[in-house]
């Protein structure tokens, strides 16, 4: 008989907090929740506050709130004025000096929402890592979520950091994002950027893979049953697979001549395509922040300038980009007092 004599170790504060954070509850908190919940709450709350009450008159010369007559598609939390540079515009900083109304007027809510939103997304990614570790599964969900994080950080933070000020970032609103897309096209020819092309291929390719995969699984479900839909035929305790990979493989082998024969490779490919698209788009946006150019077909531009009868879709788009720049520069930066005489506005062969 062995008798073990020991002393109970006192549990430290860290262990007590760790137990409380990881307690089984309806909404898991965890250590990641200490970052996620406050930042996400403040970002969403700041956005609702801005779109409801705060004007963009002092930063953009625009109405941007429900209070001023905007609707869900036209309301926005707009970026600070160009004169603010890259200031964080803290409420207690030299710009607002603790005046909340003044802080809202000069665009403080935008930096508030952008920074808290970025940390909220990072917190959600860490939440997926934390729960995956506790449950005992691989962290591919968190790895996949790095794609949206890279897009948010590159578009809302890195791009304006490479430009003159936060003013050139997108404002947080539907129509505001559309304006930003037109800006990227006019000033950077974004649609002809190879990183944008890879991003489009990744996102649309991921959507296509998702649709094909869902349809194929529905087509090859076991035990359909007599119900109007196939969902009730599934039971969590059934011993066999939900669908037939062999049948799906045979179907697509007949369609294309090739098919995925391995579920792991199939699902990794479905993960890889859209996430790679998001990352390549983010890399492209960082390139735009540094004013890297897209494809230039100068020979076509020179020939179009010399020959009135020669024009391509590329040269037409270049002229449209010039029109966007001429219009947006004066509209977006009224403090610069840009004046464009009629003779310098773009007039192409077909415009």
Swiss-Prot record:
Annotated chlorophyll a PD2 binding lies at 196
Which keywords does UniProt give here? Chlorophyll, Chloroplast, Chromophore, Electron transport, Iron, Magnesium, Membrane, Metal-binding, Oxidoreductase, Photosynthesis, Photosystem II, Plastid, Thylakoid, Transmembrane, Transmembrane helix, Transport
Q: Name one GO molecular function term.
A: chlorophyll binding
How does the protein associate with the membrane?
A: Multi-pass membrane protein
Q: Which reaction does it catalyse?
A: 2 a plastoquinone + 4 hnu + 2 H2O = 2 a plastoquinol + O2
Main localization, broad class: plastid
Q: Where does this protein hold chlorophyll a ChlzD2?
A: 116
Enzyme Commission code(s) on record? 1.10.3.9
What is one process in the GO biological process aspect for this record?
photosynthetic electron transport in photosystem II
For this protein, what does the record note about how its cofactor is bound?
The D1/D2 heterodimer binds P680, chlorophylls that are the primary electron donor of PSII, and subsequent electron acceptors. It shares a non-heme iron and each subunit binds pheophytin, quinone, additional chlorophylls, carotenoids and lipids. There is also a Cl(-1) ion associated with D1 and D2, which is required for oxygen evolution. The PSII complex binds additional chlorophylls, carotenoids and specific lipids.
The family note in this entry says: Belongs to the reaction center PufL/M/PsbA/D family.
What PANTHER family does its record include? PHOTOSYSTEM II D2 PROTEIN (PTHR33149:SF12), PHOTOSYSTEM II PROTEIN D1 (PTHR33149)
Name it. Photosystem II D2 protein
Give the organism the record lists.
Heterosigma akashiwo (strain NIES-293 / 8280G21-1)
Starting at the broadest rank, the lineage of the source organism is:
Eukaryota, Sar, Stramenopiles, Ochrophyta, Raphidophyceae
């Amino acid at each position: 008989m062995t008798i073990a004599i020991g002393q109970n170790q006192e549990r430290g504060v860290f262990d007590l907090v760790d137990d409380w954070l990881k307690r089984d509850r309806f909404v898991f908190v965890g250590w990641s929740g200490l970052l996620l919940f406050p930042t996400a709450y403040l970002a969403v709350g700041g956005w609702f506050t801005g779109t409801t009450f705060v004007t963009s008159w002092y930063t953009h010369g625009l109405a941007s709130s429900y209070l001023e007559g905007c609707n869900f598609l036209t309301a926005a939390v707009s970026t600070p004025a160009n004169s603010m540079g890259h200031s964080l515009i803290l409420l207690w900083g030299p710009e607002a000096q603790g005046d909340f109304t003044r802080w809202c007027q000069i665009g403080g809510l935008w930096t508030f929402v952008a920074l808290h939103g970025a940390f909220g997304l990072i917190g959600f990614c860490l939440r997926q890592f934390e729960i995956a570790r506790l449950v005992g599964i691989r962290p591919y969900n968190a790895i996949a979520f790095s794609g949206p994080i890279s897009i948010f950080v590159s578009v809302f933070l890195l791009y304006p950091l490479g430009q003159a000020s936060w003013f050139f970032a997108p404002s947080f609103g539907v129509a505001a994002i559309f304006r930003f897309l037109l800006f990227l096209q006019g000033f950077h020819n974004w649609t002809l950027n190879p990183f944008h092309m890879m991003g489009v291929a990744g996102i649309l390719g991921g959507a296509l893979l998702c649709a094909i995969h869902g349809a194929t699984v529905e087509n090859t479900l076991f035990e359909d049953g007599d119900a109007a839909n196939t969902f009730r035929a599934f039971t969590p305790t059934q011993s066999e697979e939900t669908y037939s990979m062999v049948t799906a493989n045979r179907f697509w082998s007949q369609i294309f001549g090739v098919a995925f024969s391995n579920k792991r490779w199939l699902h990794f490919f479905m993960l890889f395509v859209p996430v790679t698209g998001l990352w390549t788009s983010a890399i492209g946006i960082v390139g735009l922040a540094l004013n890297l150019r897209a494809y230039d077909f100068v020979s076509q531009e020179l020939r179009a300038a010399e020959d009135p009868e020669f024009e391509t879709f590329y040269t037409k788009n270049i002229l449209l980009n010039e029109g966007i720049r001429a219009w947006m520069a004066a509209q977006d930066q009224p403090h610069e007092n840009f004046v464009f005489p009629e003779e310098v506005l773009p007039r192409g062969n077909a415009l």
